[in-house]
Protein backbone atom coordinates (compact mmCIF):
# COMPACT_ATOMS: atom_id res chain seq x y z
CA UNK A 1 0.00 0.00 0.00
CA UNK A 2 1.32 3.43 -0.95
CA UNK A 3 1.71 5.89 1.89
CA UNK A 4 0.97 9.28 0.40
CA UNK A 5 3.16 11.89 2.14
CA UNK A 6 0.43 14.55 2.15
CA UNK A 7 -1.99 12.20 3.95
CA UNK A 8 0.29 11.69 6.93
CA UNK A 9 -0.86 13.66 9.97
CA UNK A 10 -3.11 15.91 7.89
CA UNK A 11 -4.98 16.85 11.03
CA UNK A 12 -1.84 18.54 12.27
CA UNK A 13 -2.05 21.04 9.42
CA UNK A 14 -4.51 23.88 9.40
CA UNK A 15 -4.96 23.56 5.65
CA UNK A 16 -3.84 20.40 3.87
CA UNK A 17 -2.41 21.11 0.43
CA UNK A 18 -4.49 19.63 -2.43
CA UNK A 19 -1.83 17.31 -3.80
CA UNK A 20 -4.18 14.70 -5.21
CA UNK A 21 -6.11 17.29 -7.18
CA UNK A 22 -2.85 18.90 -8.27
CA UNK A 23 -1.65 15.57 -9.69
CA UNK A 24 -4.75 15.21 -11.89
CA UNK A 25 -3.28 16.90 -14.96
CA UNK A 26 -2.59 14.92 -18.16
CA UNK A 27 1.18 15.36 -17.92
CA UNK A 28 1.36 13.51 -14.59
CA UNK A 29 -1.19 10.74 -15.10
CA UNK A 30 1.40 8.34 -16.53
CA UNK A 31 3.46 8.36 -13.36
CA UNK A 32 3.15 5.34 -11.10
CA UNK A 33 1.83 5.80 -7.57
CA UNK A 34 5.37 5.46 -6.26
CA UNK A 35 6.59 8.16 -8.66
CA UNK A 36 3.70 10.45 -7.76
CA UNK A 37 4.42 10.00 -4.07
CA UNK A 38 8.10 10.78 -4.61
CA UNK A 39 7.21 13.80 -6.75
CA UNK A 40 4.91 15.19 -4.06
CA UNK A 41 7.63 14.79 -1.45
CA UNK A 42 10.00 16.83 -3.62
CA UNK A 43 7.30 19.40 -4.37
CA UNK A 44 6.58 19.88 -0.67
CA UNK A 45 10.25 20.61 -0.07
CA UNK A 46 10.29 22.89 -3.10
CA UNK A 47 7.49 25.02 -1.64
CA UNK A 48 9.36 25.18 1.67
CA UNK A 49 12.60 26.31 0.01
CA UNK A 50 11.36 28.58 -2.80
CA UNK A 51 9.21 31.69 -2.73
CA UNK A 52 6.43 31.97 -5.33
CA UNK A 53 5.77 35.65 -6.01
CA UNK A 54 2.56 36.62 -7.87
CA UNK A 55 2.79 39.85 -9.88
CA UNK A 56 0.37 42.33 -11.47
CA UNK A 57 -2.66 41.14 -9.53
CA UNK A 58 -2.23 37.44 -10.25
CA UNK A 59 -3.93 35.36 -7.55
CA UNK A 60 -1.89 32.38 -6.39
CA UNK A 61 -3.92 29.79 -4.50
CA UNK A 62 -2.80 26.49 -2.98
CA UNK A 63 -3.78 24.37 -6.01
CA UNK A 64 -1.85 26.57 -8.40
CA UNK A 65 1.16 26.56 -6.07
CA UNK A 66 1.10 22.76 -5.85
CA UNK A 67 0.91 22.31 -9.62
CA UNK A 68 3.73 24.76 -10.20
CA UNK A 69 5.88 22.90 -7.66
CA UNK A 70 5.08 19.51 -9.22
CA UNK A 71 6.15 20.70 -12.66
CA UNK A 72 9.37 22.17 -11.29
CA UNK A 73 10.22 18.87 -9.61
CA UNK A 74 9.34 16.51 -12.47
CA UNK A 75 12.68 17.00 -14.30
CA UNK A 76 14.63 16.40 -11.06
CA UNK A 77 12.51 13.48 -9.86
CA UNK A 78 15.58 11.22 -9.92
CA UNK A 79 18.32 13.86 -9.88
CA UNK A 80 17.27 15.35 -6.56
CA UNK A 81 16.02 18.76 -5.44
CA UNK A 82 19.56 20.07 -4.96
CA UNK A 83 19.74 20.41 -8.75
CA UNK A 84 17.35 23.35 -8.35
CA UNK A 85 19.50 25.18 -5.81
CA UNK A 86 20.47 28.02 -8.17
CA UNK A 87 17.47 30.23 -7.38
CA UNK A 88 15.18 31.15 -4.50
CA UNK A 89 12.22 32.91 -6.12
CA UNK A 90 9.72 32.22 -8.89
CA UNK A 91 8.03 35.36 -10.22
CA UNK A 92 4.65 34.74 -11.83
CA UNK A 93 2.88 37.17 -14.15
CA UNK A 94 -0.75 36.55 -15.12
CA UNK A 95 0.14 36.58 -18.85
CA UNK A 96 3.20 36.99 -21.13
CA UNK A 97 5.10 40.12 -20.11
CA UNK A 98 7.11 42.87 -21.80
CA UNK A 99 10.82 43.33 -21.07
CA UNK A 100 13.53 45.68 -22.30
CA UNK A 101 16.05 43.71 -24.34
CA UNK A 102 19.54 44.92 -25.21
CA UNK A 103 21.67 43.21 -27.84
CA UNK A 104 24.77 43.88 -29.92
CA UNK A 105 24.88 43.30 -33.68
CA UNK A 106 27.74 41.95 -35.78
CA UNK A 107 29.39 45.37 -36.15
CA UNK A 108 29.20 46.24 -32.48
CA UNK A 109 26.15 48.50 -32.43
CA UNK A 110 23.98 48.12 -29.33
CA UNK A 111 20.23 47.95 -29.88
CA UNK A 112 17.38 48.28 -27.39
CA UNK A 113 13.89 46.98 -27.93
CA UNK A 114 10.83 45.92 -25.96
CA UNK A 115 9.85 42.30 -26.46
CA UNK A 116 7.14 39.99 -25.14
CA UNK A 117 8.42 37.05 -23.10
CA UNK A 118 6.74 33.91 -21.80
CA UNK A 119 9.45 33.18 -19.28
CA UNK A 120 13.01 33.93 -18.24
CA UNK A 121 15.71 32.13 -16.31
CA UNK A 122 18.68 33.99 -14.84
CA UNK A 123 21.78 32.05 -13.83
CA UNK A 124 21.97 33.52 -10.32
CA UNK A 125 18.51 35.02 -10.18
CA UNK A 126 14.83 34.10 -10.15
CA UNK A 127 12.83 32.21 -12.71
CA UNK A 128 10.10 34.34 -14.30
CA UNK A 129 6.92 32.70 -15.63
CA UNK A 130 3.39 33.57 -16.67
CA UNK A 131 0.22 31.74 -15.65
CA UNK A 132 -1.38 31.49 -19.10
CA UNK A 133 1.55 29.46 -20.41
CA UNK A 134 1.85 27.49 -17.18
CA UNK A 135 -1.74 26.33 -17.70
CA UNK A 136 -0.89 25.30 -21.26
CA UNK A 137 1.91 23.19 -19.77
CA UNK A 138 -0.49 20.79 -18.05
CA UNK A 139 -1.20 18.82 -21.25
CA UNK A 140 1.07 16.23 -22.84
CA UNK A 141 1.54 18.36 -25.95
CA UNK A 142 5.27 19.05 -26.28
CA UNK A 143 4.98 22.51 -24.72
CA UNK A 144 5.96 23.10 -21.11
CA UNK A 145 7.16 26.51 -19.96
CA UNK A 146 8.32 25.38 -16.52
CA UNK A 147 10.33 22.43 -17.81
CA UNK A 148 11.89 24.74 -20.42
CA UNK A 149 13.11 27.18 -17.78
CA UNK A 150 14.21 24.40 -15.43
CA UNK A 151 16.28 22.94 -18.28
CA UNK A 152 18.12 26.26 -18.58
CA UNK A 153 18.89 26.13 -14.85
CA UNK A 154 20.19 22.57 -15.17
CA UNK A 155 22.23 23.63 -18.20
CA UNK A 156 23.99 26.46 -16.36
CA UNK A 157 25.17 24.11 -13.61
CA UNK A 158 27.83 23.06 -16.12
CA UNK A 159 29.41 26.52 -16.46
CA UNK A 160 28.91 30.26 -16.61
CA UNK A 161 26.32 30.17 -19.37
CA UNK A 162 23.79 27.83 -20.92
CA UNK A 163 25.47 25.77 -23.64
CA UNK A 164 23.02 22.96 -24.30
CA UNK A 165 25.26 20.52 -22.44
CA UNK A 166 24.13 19.84 -18.86
CA UNK A 167 26.40 18.58 -16.10
CA UNK A 168 27.44 15.20 -17.51
CA UNK A 169 30.72 13.24 -17.40
CA UNK A 170 33.41 14.86 -19.55
CA UNK A 171 33.80 11.71 -21.65
CA UNK A 172 30.18 12.09 -22.81
CA UNK A 173 30.30 15.76 -23.81
CA UNK A 174 31.53 15.28 -27.39
CA UNK A 175 28.86 12.69 -28.14
CA UNK A 176 26.16 14.87 -26.57
CA UNK A 177 27.23 17.89 -28.64
CA UNK A 178 27.32 15.80 -31.82
CA UNK A 179 23.81 14.43 -31.32
CA UNK A 180 22.39 17.78 -30.20
CA UNK A 181 23.75 19.62 -33.24
CA UNK A 182 22.52 16.83 -35.51
CA UNK A 183 19.04 17.31 -34.04
CA UNK A 184 19.25 21.08 -34.56
CA UNK A 185 20.23 20.59 -38.19
CA UNK A 186 17.41 18.11 -38.72
CA UNK A 187 14.86 20.49 -37.21
CA UNK A 188 16.20 23.36 -39.34
CA UNK A 189 15.89 21.24 -42.49
CA UNK A 190 12.26 20.53 -41.66
CA UNK A 191 11.61 24.22 -41.06
CA UNK A 192 13.08 25.10 -44.45
CA UNK A 193 10.92 22.43 -46.06
CA UNK A 194 7.52 23.04 -44.43
CA UNK A 195 7.87 26.33 -42.54
CA UNK A 196 8.03 27.11 -38.82
CA UNK A 197 4.31 26.75 -38.16
CA UNK A 198 4.08 23.31 -39.77
CA UNK A 199 7.24 21.86 -38.20
CA UNK A 200 6.63 18.91 -35.88
CA UNK A 201 9.16 20.23 -33.32
CA UNK A 202 9.11 23.81 -32.02
CA UNK A 203 11.31 25.85 -34.37
CA UNK A 204 12.92 27.57 -31.37
CA UNK A 205 14.95 24.39 -30.90
CA UNK A 206 16.97 25.24 -34.02
CA UNK A 207 18.00 28.69 -32.76
CA UNK A 208 20.97 27.60 -30.61
CA UNK A 209 22.17 24.61 -28.55
CA UNK A 210 20.87 25.94 -25.21
CA UNK A 211 17.38 26.42 -26.61
CA UNK A 212 17.53 23.03 -28.33
CA UNK A 213 18.24 21.35 -24.99
CA UNK A 214 15.44 23.29 -23.29
CA UNK A 215 12.86 22.68 -26.04
CA UNK A 216 13.70 18.99 -26.36
CA UNK A 217 13.46 18.67 -22.58
CA UNK A 218 9.85 19.83 -22.97
CA UNK A 219 9.24 17.10 -25.55
CA UNK A 220 11.15 14.54 -23.49
CA UNK A 221 8.64 14.82 -20.67
CA UNK A 222 5.44 15.86 -22.45
CA UNK A 223 5.68 14.32 -25.95
CA UNK A 224 8.19 11.45 -25.79
CA UNK A 225 6.48 9.69 -28.69
CA UNK A 226 7.65 12.56 -30.96
CA UNK A 227 11.19 12.86 -29.58
CA UNK A 228 12.31 9.25 -29.15
CA UNK A 229 11.80 7.83 -32.67
CA UNK A 230 13.12 10.95 -34.39
CA UNK A 231 16.35 11.35 -32.40
CA UNK A 232 16.96 7.92 -30.83
CA UNK A 233 20.61 8.47 -29.92
CA UNK A 234 19.93 11.84 -28.29
CA UNK A 235 16.87 10.36 -26.60
CA UNK A 236 19.06 7.80 -24.85
CA UNK A 237 21.38 10.56 -23.68
CA UNK A 238 18.43 12.47 -22.22
CA UNK A 239 17.22 9.29 -20.48
CA UNK A 240 20.65 8.79 -18.98
CA UNK A 241 20.92 12.41 -17.83
CA UNK A 242 17.42 12.75 -16.35
CA UNK A 243 17.46 9.10 -15.14
CA UNK A 244 13.92 8.72 -16.45
CA UNK A 245 12.27 7.16 -19.51
CA UNK A 246 8.97 8.95 -20.17
CA UNK A 247 8.28 6.87 -23.29
CA UNK A 248 8.51 3.62 -21.35
CA UNK A 249 6.35 5.23 -18.67
CA UNK A 250 3.76 6.19 -21.32
CA UNK A 251 3.71 2.70 -22.85
CA UNK A 252 3.31 1.12 -19.42
CA UNK A 253 0.41 3.43 -18.60
CA UNK A 254 -1.27 2.69 -21.94
CA UNK A 255 -0.81 -1.06 -21.44
CA UNK A 256 -2.33 -0.80 -17.97
CA UNK A 257 -5.31 1.15 -19.33
CA UNK A 258 -5.82 -1.42 -22.11
CA UNK A 259 -5.68 -4.30 -19.64
CA UNK A 260 -8.19 -2.59 -17.36
CA UNK A 261 -10.54 -1.94 -20.29
CA UNK A 262 -10.50 -5.58 -21.41
CA UNK A 263 -11.35 -6.75 -17.90
CA UNK A 264 -14.41 -4.57 -17.40
CA UNK A 265 -17.56 -6.69 -16.94
UniProtKB/Swiss-Prot annotation:
Effect seen on changing residue 206 to D: Retains 23% of wild-type protease activity with L-alanine-pNA as substrate. Decreases interaction with Mlc
Q: Which cofactor does it need?
A: Zn(2+)
Q: How is its activity regulated?
A: Proteolytic activity is stimulated by interaction with Mlc. Addition of the chelators EDTA or phenanthroline significantly reduces the peptidase activity, whereas the addition of other protease inhibitors has much less effect.
Mutagenesis or variant effect for residue 206 to S: Decreases interaction with Mlc
The cross-references to InterPro entries, in alphabetical order and at most eight, read: MetalloPept_cat_dom_sf, MtfA_enterob, MtfA_fam, MtfA_N
Which residues take part in binding Zn(2+)? 111, 148, 152, 211
Q: What is the effect of changing residue 211 to Q?
A: Retains 62% of wild-type protease activity with L-alanine-pNA as substrate. Does not affect Mlc binding
Outcome of swapping residue 152 to K: Retains 69% of wild-type protease activity with L-alanine-pNA as substrate. Does not affect Mlc binding
Consequence the record notes for mutating residue 93 to S: Retains 45% of wild-type protease activity with L-alanine-pNA as substrate. Does not affect Mlc binding
Q: How the protein is affected by changing residue 242 to S?
A: Retains 29% of wild-type protease activity with L-alanine-pNA as substrate. Decreases interaction with Mlc
What does the record say mutating residue 149 to Q does?
A: Retains 19% of wild-type protease activity with L-alanine-pNA as substrate. Does not affect Mlc binding
Q: What class of enzyme is it?
A: hydrolase
Q: Where in the cell is it found?
A: Cytoplasm
Which Gene Ontology MF annotations are present?
Answer: aminopeptidase activity; metallopeptidase activity; zinc ion binding
* Assigned keywords, A-Z: Aminopeptidase, Cytoplasm, Hydrolase, Metal-binding, Metalloprotease, Protease, Zinc
Q: What is its EC number?
A: 3.4.11.-
Domain of life of the organism in this record? Answer: Bacteria
Summarizing the annotation, the consequence of altering residue 69 to S is: No change in interaction with Mlc
What does the similarity note say? Belongs to the MtfA family.
Domain text from the record? The C-terminal part of MtfA is sufficient for Mlc binding.
What name does this protein carry?
Mlc titration factor A
